[in-house]
């Protein structure tokens, strides 16, 4: 019955778990090397970070890219967000450029494509739709664009064109990296 599936799954997962205990350190080493490259490459690192984060969204693996930077110790202890908030008054009162005060802050700019790119995507799709379909297309796209801008959730809008025009999605990822860098 249905309990056989659970029992078989448990038994099969034991050797797979042991296997991953052996091979996961290699994956972790690759992730650490990527983080080292991104933090040490300056503007190129920010570009690669943002482009890679956008490209990985359909797989859900984008969390491996941004979480260590925004909330973890990849750039500063405690993450960029935890560093930014207590220092915001200092940044606001300084006459120095922000890039001198907080050079690691460039990694926080991955959200720029959510604020500016997603409304542009929605408008481009809307105006390229046939006139008789624009009302229906707009009713799908404009709420998705508003959610992207206000909440940072871009998947509904990006998945709207990802499977129809994957090359445009790749261009979107490259432009997002360029906007952040």
Identify the residue ranges that each predicted region occupies.
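Membrane-embedded translocation segments of transport machinery
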Residues: 44-117, 123-131
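Signature of multi-pass transmembrane helix bundles
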Residues: 1-58, 65-70, 181
């Amino acid at each position: 019955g249905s309990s056989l599936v659970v029992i078989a799954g448990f038994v099969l997962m034991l050797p797979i778990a042991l296997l991953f205990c052996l091979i996961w350190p290699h994956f972790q080493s690759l992730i650490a090397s990527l983080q080292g490259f991104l933090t040490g490459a300056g503007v190129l690192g920010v570009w690669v970070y943002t482009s890679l984060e956008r490209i990985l969204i359909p797989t859900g693996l984008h969390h491996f890219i941004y979480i260590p930077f925004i909330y973890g110790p990849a750039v500063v202890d405690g993450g960029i967000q935890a560093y930014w908030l207590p220092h915001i008054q200092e940044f606001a009162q300084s006459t120095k450029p922000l890039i001198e005060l907080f050079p690691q802050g460039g990694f926080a700019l991955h959200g720029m494509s959510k604020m500016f790119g997603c409304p542009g995507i929605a408008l481009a799709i809307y105006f390229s739709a046939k006139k008789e379909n624009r009302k229906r297309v707009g009713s799908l796209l404009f709420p998705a664009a508003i959610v992207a801008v206000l909440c940072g959730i871009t998947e509904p809008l990006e998945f709207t064109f990802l499977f129809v025009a994957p090359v445009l999605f790749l261009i979107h990822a490259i432009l997002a990296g360029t906007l952040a860098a």
